[in-house]
């Protein structure tokens, strides 16, 4: 082994001072204040980033909930709107049906009105014809005046008010008539039937001054005994005289001053027949 070989080996065995110097400088850099500050800043930034991500996640969750709620509200509003639209459609359909029914009703009423108008026109024509007939009939005289009852040769009027015998006589005279006079059994039967509906007394044209005098009619003719018998106070004497009235088919005598209904009688106008 030569000297040069030992030198070379010695050189190889010596440590690399430059490399060790670099390592020492690197460790010294790691423990420098600037590196610690940078690491702390980076940690704070990472922590802030994590917090930001968490906050954003929470906000995203809230936004998602709001979107879900809003979607639910929109769905509810949609259903509500659909229900309103459906109700409106049903209302329109019902309105259309009502309108159709109303049209049919109007058409029916119009048809009935037309029919009624035709009937009214026919009735109007019939009324005109009836008026013409009444005019022709009016030119002919009736046997008895209005409200009088015709029987045989006479007309009879039954009064609606009660008066004494003398006042009743005046009433009949004002009507160009006299109080009732019965000339036959047929007349008696007719009067009895005519007043059978009533229980009131009716004055007749039969009277006498006192019991010693005969019963006389207004025209002075005497009562025929076979027609009827006068009942009641036939033997009584009254200052105003005794008069006869008919009630329930029988004839009675009474004070002429008392009030009763009356029956007027006059001749019928048979020339119109």
From Swiss-Prot:
Q: Name one Pfam family in it.
A: Lectin_C
The observed outcome of changing residue 226 to Q is: Abolishes binding to acetylated LDL (AcLDL)
Q: How is it modified after translation?
A: The intrachain disulfide-bonds prevent N-glycosylation at some sites. N-glycosylated.
Q: Record's InterPro entries?
A: C-type_lectin-like (IPR001304), C-type_lectin-like/link_sf (IPR016186), CTDL_fold (IPR016187), NKR-like_CTLD (IPR033992), OxLDL_rcpt1-like (IPR052332)
Membrane side Cytoplasmic: which residues? 1-36
Question: Which residues does the annotation flag as glycosylated?
Answer: 73, 139
Q: What is known of its domains?
A: The cytoplasmic region is required for subcellular sorting on the cell surface. The C-type lectin domain mediates the recognition and binding of oxLDL.
The protein's name: Oxidized low-density lipoprotein receptor 1
